[in-house]
Amino acid sequence: MATLSFRNLKKTYAGNVPVIHGIDMEIKDGEFIVIVGPSGCGKSTLMRMVAGLETVTSGEILIDDKPVNDLEPAERDIAMVFQNYALYPHMSVFENMAYGLKIRKVPKAEIQKRVEEAAQILELGKLLDRRPRQLSGGQRQRVAMGRAIVREPKVFLFDEPLSNLDAKLRVAMRLEILKLHRRLHTTSLYVTHDQVEAMTLAHRMVVMYQGVPEQIGTPMEVFEKPASTFVAGFIGSPPMNLIEVDVAGDGTMTAEGMPLQISPLQVPSAVRGRKIIMGLRPEHMLLNAEGIPVEIEMIETLGSEQLVHGRRGKHMLVVRCTTRQLSESTVKVGDTMNIGPDGRHDLHWFEPDTGRRVQGL
């Protein structure tokens, strides 16, 4: 196990194209960090820099406080699990898992011991003689994980390892990775675009946007207090409703010139008398409540719950409600009705010019 540190880490491609804009971060021994963000945000580039597959333009990467910028990938004592399993088709499961150790000239008895231990952890013991073509997608990914485990690295790197799996297998493999980390306690860096993976796996998550960490925190810290409108719109499914409002000195609000029936008691003094962006989580809103008049444009049926989409001028707002609540309200597409906060959860407030969360709220 090891610590992993980034010190003002930057990456610029040819033509002076910046990709990573200066990351400072300390990852504790045994911590599971998930880097999440949209395509092109720099998360995979950051992972490849740690692995030694991309050069560092400036700054430092340290493992156990030792700079590794100039070390070859094989010298960094890391193991990487990729999106595509990268298994040798002509080798058995045992041979695939053992190959890296053979290259490093580890004694045969030690190889046998490590492979059998990893196979037991990953429930691959009965599959060691099979070829990759005889395995399911989930089994192949477990073999790729086993190949990383037998190296006994200081740091595990996971580069979107579940992206090629179907939805059911992804859930199963998330549980496998959780159990694996609880057993091994190896420092891990995990890259994904899937916020569900980030929320369920991470001790802390790093939300990346345009090469910069927008927010670093525990999953619940990020969900409950997003640092910016980007984070609010990226974390959460469906994402947070964001609406531009004018707040009077007495706490009353208007949006696009129309009054909003939201109690001034829910409006803090820091946002009164100014323009602001107000955020409301779909699951923290109610139909037929005091708040925002909208025209219902769409209703999504998801079994036990429904997503009701209503338009207010240029804003599309979503309410998540149970199927029973929706049937009791008799709402249908084309209706005009009020939606509003449930009163039990805080509203969110963001600066209109920067998108950052209002300080102290």
Swiss-Prot record:
One of its GO terms (cellular component) is ATP-binding cassette (ABC) transporter complex, substrate-binding subunit-containing. GO terms for biological process: carbohydrate transport; glycerophosphodiester transmembrane transport. Pfam families: ABC_tran, OB_MalK. Its EC number is 7.6.2.10. It catalyses: sn-glycerol 3-phosphate(out) + ATP + H2O = sn-glycerol 3-phosphate(in) + ADP + phosphate + H(+). Belongs to the ABC transporter superfamily. sn-glycerol-3-phosphate importer (TC 3.A.1.1.3) family. This is sn-glycerol-3-phosphate import ATP-binding protein UgpC. It comes from Bordetella avium (strain 197N). The lineage of its organism: Bacteria, Pseudomonadati, Pseudomonadota, Betaproteobacteria, Burkholderiales.
